[in-house]
């Protein structure tokens, strides 16, 4: 009887091995940058969790309102907003942040830009969104692997939200910091207790295109400034157009005076399409040259920073609590 039992166990093990081999499980599979993960077998797309499935949203996509559950929406956001090659814990952190941001906006009454929808696919208003077909065209041969990976990031954080005083926060994020983030009050009008300066681990070696340079002739600079700020006085020598650069304790430009008009650093970044408000500027040979560090407004969660922290072993929940001060991660049914 014992011999028969051993034979049956061996046969079951052989069947299991053959099934996995047929699914390509033992093939050389794509991995993250440190080669630490293995994907689910092809075709095993994680289903949205119970909490996300129970939340129906109205999303305006390319001008048309579509109904979908929270999990489906978040998967589309992840496809568009964070490199799928990133660590799984970073992708989970992104899913938590995007879910939180969406609930925060809904709780606040939505946007006048889309009164009939909870959110839209315009990243300047809400969050970018890609459907599976669009993402697959971008990913090529990695499409199945990446789709499975992002679906896991959503399903394994089902319903998780970043909370301050029991309510969803304004969970903003950006690409890469200059060594630290900056507080909301440094960029926008209102300071928020959970959007404060924190350290961020980016370096030139760890982030592609960490440094960038933007050059404008005096005529180009004048045209861009006057289009946005017609009251600026740029009649004198260009050497005197930019004055009084003030930096905050994160070393981002807090304010700068251009042609007599005081601007926030992030405003000048927007006007000139600079990658970040962390910059220096020099005028030489009738041109302004901006040396820029990082990418994005610098408030909230740095995506590249999140990926580096994930490589260092932090969980998604630890990552979001690092970037969003004084918060907890839990559920919100409001």
Task: Give, region by region, the residue ranges found by the protein language model.
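Conserved, single-site charged/polar hotspot
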Residues: 1-334
């Amino acid at each position: 009887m014992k011999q028969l039992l051993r034979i049956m166990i061996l046969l079951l093990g052989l069947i299991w091995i053959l099934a996995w081999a047929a699914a390509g499980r033992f093939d050389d599979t794509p991995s993250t940058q440190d080669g630490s993960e293995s994907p689910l077998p092809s075709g095993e797309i994680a289903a949205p969790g119970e909490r996300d499935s129970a939340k129906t949203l109205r999303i305006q996509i390319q001008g048309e309102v579509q109904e979908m559950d929270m999990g489906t929406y978040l998967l589309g956001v992840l496809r568009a907003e964070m490199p799928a090659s990133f660590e799984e814990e970073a992708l989970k952190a992104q899913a938590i942040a995007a879910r939180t941001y969406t609930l925060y906006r809904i709780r606040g009454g939505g946007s006048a830009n889309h009164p009939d929808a909870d959110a839209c696919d315009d990243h300047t208003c809400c969050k970018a969104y890609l459907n599976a077909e669009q993402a697959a065209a971008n990913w090529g041969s990695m499409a199945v692997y990446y789709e499975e990976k992002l679906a896991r990031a959503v399903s394994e954080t089902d319903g998780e939200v970043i909370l301050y005083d029991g309510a969803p926060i304004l969970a903003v994020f950006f690409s890469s910091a200059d060594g630290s983030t900056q507080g909301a009050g440094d960029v926008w009008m209102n300071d928020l207790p959970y959007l404060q300066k924190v350290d961020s681990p980016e370096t030139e070696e760890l982030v592609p295109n960490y440094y960038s340079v933007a050059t404008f002739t005096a005529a180009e600079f004048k045209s861009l400034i006057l289009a946005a700020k017609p009251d600026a006085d740029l009649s004198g020598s260009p050497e005197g157009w930019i004055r009084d650069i003030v930096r905050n304790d994160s070393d981002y430009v807090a304010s700068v005076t251009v042609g007599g008009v005081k601007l926030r650093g992030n405003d000048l970044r927007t006007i000139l399409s600079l990658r970040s408000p962390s910059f220096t500027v020099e005028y030489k040979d009738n041109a302004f040259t901006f040396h820029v560090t990082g990418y994005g407004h610098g408030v909230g969660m740095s995506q590249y920073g999140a990926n580096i922290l994930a490589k260092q072993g932090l969980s998604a929940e630890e990552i979001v609590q690092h970037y969003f001060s004084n918060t907890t991660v839990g559920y919100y049914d409001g």
